[in-house]
Each structure stands twice: as structure tokens, then as C-alpha cells.
Regions:
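C-terminal substrate-binding/catalytic lobe of Rossmann-fold NAD(P)-dependent oxidoreductases
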Residues: 41-99
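C-terminal helix-rich "cap/oligomerization" subdomain common to oxidoreductases
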Residues: 102-165
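Short glycine/serine- and small hydrophobic-enriched flexible loop segments
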Residues: 20-21, 98, 122
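Rossmann-like dinucleotide-binding domain that binds NAD(P)(H)
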Residues: 1-65, 111-118
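Short, well-ordered secondary-structure micro-motifs
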Residues: 12-13, 70, 147
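A general structural signal for well-ordered alpha-helical segments in protein cores
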Residues: 15-16, 89, 93, 120
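Short secondary-structure transition/capping segments
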Residues: 1-4, 21-29, 48-55, 76-88, ...
């Protein structure tokens, strides 16, 4: 189970990337499970099924900050940890520097990043279709998508002058 807060894509994509980092590629379907709300805030839950039998559950919280929390359950034990959000970008920059210096690094490969986006798009398609299982291979340009321009404008408005033209 992976959890993030902020919005369904900006923070949610990092949860999908974390799933890829833990499980690898091979996601087959995503299913929207539902929404819970309280005091004007809401969370949504999604189920991801992989070809190798592994499954993942991720939750997004909209309009409220939540830490990145990961719980891994196996047939033998459970493990839970919270990512230190104050160090995430520092860690990413260190890995980018290693990559640029041709040193070993832990950056996600392109197939993992692409599958992360497909997981999010399949989740949006499932939500739009009332919670049906959506195969990643069935995604099309006609399905739900994310509006990069609208995202950038909202992000810039919330973040200040650094992100404006």
C-alpha cells in the first residue's frame, strides 16, 4: 500500500513510480476502488495487478498534504516506512549527478517511468468508468488524460514566481 497527498497526479505519479521501483514493470490492470471524504478533503484508492501475481494498492489524498508512506506485505511479514519528504529532491539530484558522471545510479529506467504514467492513466480511466478493471494495453488517446498546461498553470499559481513565465 502506498499513500501520497497533494493531488492525484503531481504526488500520485511519484507513488506509481515508487511501485515501479519496488515491483518493476509488468502492471496489467488498474481498478479504481472508491473515494472517501471528510471535512471537505477526499482520498481515492486504486488496485494494480501485475503479470507476476504481485498486486499494489495506492491511495491519493487531494487538497491535503500527506507523507509518502509505503507498506509492503509478503507471505512472511509486513514492512512499513515513511519517506523523508525533506530529502527526496536532494536524493534525486544526487542520483542525477551520478548518472551525469557515468557512475552507478538508481534512477528509474524509461520503461518504468512510462508504465508509471500508464498506471495513473488507467486509474483515471477506471474512475471515469465507475471502477472497471482497465488493462494498460487498452489505453488510447481518446481516454482520460492529464492536461499539462492546466497542471503547470495551477502549480505555478500555488508555487510562486519561480514557475511563471
Amino acid at each position: 500500500t502506498l499513500t501520497a497527498g497533494g493531488d492525484d497526479f503531481n504526488s500520485g505519479i511519484h507513488i506509481a513510480e515508487a511501485i515501479g521501483g519496488l515491483v518493476g514493470t509488468g502492471a496489467q490492470t488498474v481498478q479504481y476502488l472508491g473515494r472517501g471524504s471528510a471535512q471537505g478533503q477526499y482520498s481515492e484508492s486504486y488496485y494494480v495487478q501485475f503479470a507476476n501475481g504481485v498486486s499494489a494498492l495506492y491511495n491519493t489524498f487531494t487538497s491535503t498534504w500527506q507523507p509518502f508512506v509505503v507498506t509492503i506485505m509478503t507471505t512472511k511479514s509486513s514492512y512499513s516506512f515513511k519517506m523523508d519528504s525533506s530529502r527526496l529532491y536532494e536524493a534525486l539530484l544526487q542520483e542525477i549527478c551520478c548518472f551525469m558522471e557515468h557512475k552507478p545510479n538508481r534512477l528509474a529506467d524509461v520503461p518504468t517511468l512510462i508504465e508509471s504514467v500508464k498506471i495513473m492513466l488507467a486509474g483515471a480511466a477506471s474512475r471515469a468508468d465507475g471502477g472497471s478493471k482497465v488493462p494498460l494495453c487498452d489505453l488510447s488517446e481518446d481516454g482520460p488524460c492529464y492536461d499539462g498546461t492546466a497542471f503547470w498553470k495551477n502549480y505555478a499559481a500555488a508555487s510562486g514566481p519561480m514557475y511563471t513565465l
